[in-house]
């Protein structure tokens, strides 16, 4: 009901991972490196195969950490969507309802471009992990990656603020 109401009101829903309690392999920093991006990816997967995006067509979600593993595993995701859902849709159909932030905490143009190739310039929002991560890495690194990306300046400005203004209805 919450997701349906958010869609009715035009509110985007921010999906941020939680600690995976009781998972013994999540030690020595692996939660931040793998756990949270995995948790985000799993949540989105469950929303796709559970029909949430199909049932709530106006739902818009913002995924932290550049969508976790979603942009990197599109082929595998599409294979499994075909096998495990009745909706006959591809990941590329669902991403119209998804936005991702740039909180990958570094100057990785390559990571940004993988997300860009799936989500396009309109569905990427500037984001950071500050204050939990050093601001130079989280904010400065993400800014540097966007500025260095081989995309038009107008799209960089969209990512740096224009998309968020549009999504939140403040433009």
Predicted regions and their residues:
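Catalytic pocket-lining loop regions of alpha/beta-barrel enzymes
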Residues: 1-125
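Mid-to-C-terminal alpha-helical segments outside catalytic/metal-binding sites
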Residues: 51, 59, 100, 110-114, ...
């Amino acid at each position: 009901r919450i997701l349906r109401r958010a869609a009715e009101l035009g509110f985007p829903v921010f999906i941020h991972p939680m600690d995976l309690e009781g998972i013994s392999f999540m030690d020595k920093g692996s939660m931040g490196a793998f756990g949270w991006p995995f948790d985000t990816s799993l949540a989105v997967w469950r929303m796709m195969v559970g029909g949430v995006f199909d049932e709530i067509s106006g739902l818009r979600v913002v995924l932290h950490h550049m969508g976790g593993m979603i942009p990197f595993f599109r082929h595998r995701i599409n294979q499994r969507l075909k096998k495990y859902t009745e909706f006959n849709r591809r990941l590329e159909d669902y991403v119209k309802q998804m936005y991702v932030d740039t909180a990958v905490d570094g100057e990785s143009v390559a990571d940004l471009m993988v997300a860009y190739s799936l989500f396009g310039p309109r569905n990427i929002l500037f984001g950071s992990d500050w204050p939990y991560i050093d601001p130079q890495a989280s904010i400065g690194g993400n800014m540097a990656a966007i500025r260095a990306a081989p995309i038009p300046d107008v799209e960089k400005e969209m990512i740096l603020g224009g998309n968020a203004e549009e999504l939140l209805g403040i433009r």
